[in-house]
Regions:
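Alpha-helical recognition/docking segments in bacterial nutrient-uptake
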Residues: 1-88, 152, 270-271
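Residue-level detector of anion-binding/catalytic polar loops
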Residues: 8-10, 59, 96-97, 127, ...
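Hinge/beta->alpha junction and helix N-cap segments in small-molecule ligand-binding domains
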Residues: 13-22, 75-85, 101-146, 161-170, ...
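Glycine-rich phosphate/diphosphate-binding loops that line cofactor/substrate pockets in enzymes
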Residues: 87-98
Length: 271
C-alpha cells in the first residue's frame, strides 16, 4: 500500500470463495471501472484470472509465474532454487533418503518447487524415490496426514522437504504421534517463513520470503504496466533467505530405526 500511496494510487483487496466468484468479481470491477489494474497472487499453472484479464487487455501483474507467459508481467520468488538448496543442506548433514511433500499441483509454484527438489537430488547424486514424493498439502492437517504416510513407509525418509510452511507445521504432531522427534529422528526444511514456524519446538528451518518487499515491487510494477510499459519488460524474480531453526540436522536415526520406533509407538497405542 505504501508504494501505491506514494504514486497517489489506491489499493483495494478483493477476495472470493472460489474461482467462479473471483472471475465474476473481476468482471464487475472492470465493467464498473473501479480498477485500473490487478495484482494476482498465488497463480495457477493455467490461471483463469490471468486468461480473463489478458483477453480483455486489462493491466495486471502476477505474484508468481504461469505456464503460458505471453502478455504477463510478474514478480516471483525462486522457490525452485530454495528447494534445491534445501536438499543440498540436508545432504550436507548426512541425509541420503529424503522425502518431498508438495503443495497443490494446481498452483504453478508446486511444479517449480518439484523441479527444484529433483534438481537438488540430481546435484547430490541421489536417486529419486517416487513413493517418497507426495503432493496436495496446503494446510497443517494435510501436512500431518502426508507426513504420517511417509514415516509409515517400509523404508521411511530421515528428512523431508516441504513446499509450504503450513504443511510442515503438521509434521510436528505427526512425528509426535509416531514416537519421533523433529530435528533429531526426522529433519524437515520448508518454505515461506510464516511467523508460526518460530513458535513450534524446535523452530522450523525455512526459506523466508520478504512479503513487504514483494508487495512494494508488485505495486510498482503494476503502476508501470498501467502507464503502458510492455509486460515483457516487467518481469522480476528474487531469492528466498534461509532462516535456520532447529528442525534440521544430522540424522540421529536410520530409516530402519524409524520403522522400529513407529511400530513401537503404534503397539503402545493399541495396548
Amino acid at each position: 500500500t505504501t508504494a501505491a500511496s506514494e504514486e497517489s494510487w489506491t489499493l483495494t483487496v478483493a477476495t472470493s470463495a472460489g474461482e467462479a466468484e473471483m472471475l465474476a468479481t473481476l468482471e464487475r470491477l472492470i465493467d464498473e471501472r473501479k480498477a485500473d489494474g490487478f495484482i494476482l497472487p498465488r497463480t495457477g499453472t493455467h490461471d483463469a484470472r490471468m486468461r480473463l484479464l489478458r483477453s480483455l487487455n486489462v493491466p495486471f501483474v502476477l505474484y508468481g509465474r504461469v505456464a503460458d507467459p505471453e502478455g504477463c508481467a510478474w514478480y516471483d520468488i525462486l522457490g525452485e532454487e530454495a528447494m534445491r538448496e534445501a536438499v543440498l543442506r540436508l545432504v550436507s548433514h548426512g541425509h541420503r533418503r529424503i522425502g518431498f511433500i508438495n503443495g497443490g499441483m494446481e498452483y504453478n509454484f508446486s511444479g517449480l518447487r518439484e523441479e527444484g527438489f529433483r534438481q537438488g537430488m540430481a546435484d547430490a547424486g541421489l536417486d529419486l524415490q517416487a513413493d517418497l514424493m507426495l503432493s496436495g498439502a496446503m494446510t497443517r492437517e494435510a501436512g500431518s496426514a502426508l507426513t504420517r504416510r511417509l514415516l509409515s513407509h517400509d523404508a521411511p525418509p530421515t528428512a523431508i522437504v516441504f513446499a509450504v510452511d503450513a504443511a510442515a507445521l503438521g509434521a510436528y504432531e505427526a512425528a509426535e504421534a509416531l514416537g519421533l522427534e523433529i530435528g533429531a529422528d526426522v529433519s524437515i526444511i520448508s518454505y515461506d517463513g510464516i511467523p508460526e514456524g518460530a513458535w513450534v519446538r524446535p523452530p522450523l528451518t525455512t526459506f523466508s520470503v520478504d512479503s513487504r518487499v514483494a508487495g512494494k515491487r508488485l505495486a510498482e510494477l503494476l503502476i508501470r504496466r498501467i502507464r503502458g510499459e510492455a509486460p515483457e519488460d516487467l518481469r522480476e524474480t528474487a531469492t528466498a533467505s534461509l532462516q535456520v531453526g532447529g528442525s534440521d540436522g544430522p540424522p540421529a536415526a536410520t530409516s530402519e530405526t524409524i520403522v522400529l520406533r513407529v511400530n513401537a509407538a503404534r503397539a503402545g497405542t493399541v495396548t
